[in-house]
From Swiss-Prot:
Cellular localization per UniProt: Cytoplasm
Family annotation (Pfam families): Ribosomal_S10 (PF00338)
Entry keyword NAD: no
Name of this protein: Small ribosomal subunit protein uS10
GO molecular function: structural constituent of ribosome
Annotated organism of origin: Schizosaccharomyces pombe (strain 972 / ATCC 24843) (Fission yeast)
SUPFAM superfamilies with a match to the protein in the record: Ribosomal protein S10
Gene Ontology biological-process annotations: cytoplasmic translation; ribosome biogenesis
Keywords of this entry: Cytoplasm, Phosphoprotein, Ribonucleoprotein, Ribosomal protein
Length: 118
C-alpha cells in the first residue's frame, strides 16, 4: 500500500519548466557557431522551445603602440585588435533535460554560461 502512495506522489509532482539562458562567448567565430548549432539541434531533437541563437554585437578591443622601442626614427604605429563574439540561446524546459543537452563536446576557446530563471 505504501508503494502505491509513493508512486502517486511522484506522479503528482510536475517537472517545473524553467527559462534557461545559455550565453556563449569566443574569439573564434567558427567554433562558436559550431557549438551553437549543436546545442540548438540537440534541443530541437528533445522537442523543446528554443529561441536563438541571438547574435550580440561584437566587442572590438584595440591597442595602438609605436613600432620602434626607442623614440628615434619615423613615427610608425602598429594596431592590434581582439574581437569577442557573443551568442544567446533561450530554452524553456526542466533543468534535468538541460543537463543532457549541454553534455556535448565544447570546442576549445568557447566559454559557456548557463543561467536558470523561473
Amino acid at each position: 500500500m505504501s508503494q502505491v502512495a509513493k508512486d502517486q506522489k511522484e506522479q503528482q509532482i510536475p517537472s517545473t519548466v524553467h527559462r534557461i539562458r545559455i550565453t556563449l562567448t569566443s574569439r573564434n567565430v567558427r567554433n562558436l557557431e559550431k557549438v551553437c548549432s549543436d546545442l540548438v539541434n540537440r534541443a530541437k531533437d528533445k522537442q523543446l522551445r528554443v529561441k536563438g541563437p541571438v547574435r550580440l554585437p561584437t566587442k572590438i578591443l584595440k591597442i595602438t603602440t609605436r613600432k620602434t622601442p626607442n623614440g628615434e626614427g619615423s613615427k610608425t604605429w602598429e594596431t592590434y585588435e581582439m574581437r569577442i563574439h557573443k551568442r544567446l540561446i533561450d530554452l524553456h524546459s526542466p533543468s534535468e533535460i538541460v543537463k543532457q543537452i549541454t553534455s556535448i563536446h565544447i570546442e576549445p576557446g568557447v566559454e559557456v554560461e548557463v543561467t536558470i530563471a523561473q
